[in-house]
Amino acid sequence: MSNSVAQARRWTEFLARRLEFPAGEALIAQFEAGQIERLCDCGCNSYIFSPSADPAIPLLAHADGKYGSVFEVLFRAGADNATVEFLVFANGNGALAGLDVHYCGNAYPMPEAVVFLEPPIHVRTSPSVVA
């Protein structure tokens, strides 16, 4: 599945709707207000994000001055025990900095159609996420 702004939006909206992610509304607000700085072209569906400086936009995480992953979720996908991993990154101010979307640990390109097996097999939410 080729990476595009439309695909980035679909993955972002998918995560925002997940019950496991407590900051879904903030994720959508951040995505709508900022802009994608770079789409990865390696075969994954990741992007680097440039957030809005508008202080009215809700943050994903409490500002701690550090860039890092604030949410991770891993799904089995399809019958071949493949996995799809999502990692949400925040900058030191707590704003969206990017989203990594990998298939099989980024060993293979993202296929055109992915069927997720529920429930996710791994979920990690940073204590810094604003719920």
Regions found by a protein language model. Give the residues of each.
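Short, compact, well-ordered microdomains
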Residues: 77-125
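N-terminal domain-onset segments
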Residues: 1-74, 110-131
